[in-house]
Amino acid sequence: MQKKTDRRVRKTKTQLRNGLAMLMKEKSVGEITVKELVDQVDINRSTFYLHYPDISGLLYEIENDLSEEMERAIREHPIEKREDNGFHFLQDIFQVLDNNREIVSALVGPYGDMRFIQKVEVILARNSREVLEQMFPEKSDQMDYFYAYCLNGCLGFVKTWLADKKSCTPEFAADFIYRMVVSSMRAFCETREEV
């Protein structure tokens, strides 16, 4: 009996998640009401309140679930100084993004939640910044610029990739970003110090 209940709960939460993603394409989270959401997914308000106190509670759970999936991908393939190591990490991250394409697209879209983007930036910084500083100790005074360049380029790519209806595969996206970052690292290594 418990498995049946779990399946229904998962189905309801998936419906709410997908409904929120659809509404976030039209308006910000702060403008979305519980009534709009439950009408969108055709469930009762009482069912919504059984799982969440409000829209923010739903959003919080979604963002935490996505963050945990990204953290898991990083734990399974930690970023190290070896060049070839980053590719597997990127493959896993792009698979997480692809598996959650609709909600991630809404979160990073024009009506999205900046807190989610900042949370992703913190996760990536916590797991990659130190490695870059170890790889380029002589470039520590330029590291902020290089890191911002790579991070914002990757985030821009992700937004474009998510918005593209005929999007390339997660594997291609990971390979593309991997090659761009490695190429940028080589160029960074060759930059001269400011005079």
Residue ranges and their predicted role:
Residues 1-27:
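Basic, helix-initiating cap at the start of DNA-binding domains
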Residues 22-29, 73, 77, 100, ...:
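Basic, amphipathic alpha-helical hairpins
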Residues 23-57:
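Helix-turn-helix
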Residues 33-34, 62-71:
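Short, basic, alpha-helical segments at the C-terminal edge of helix-turn-helix-like DNA-binding modules
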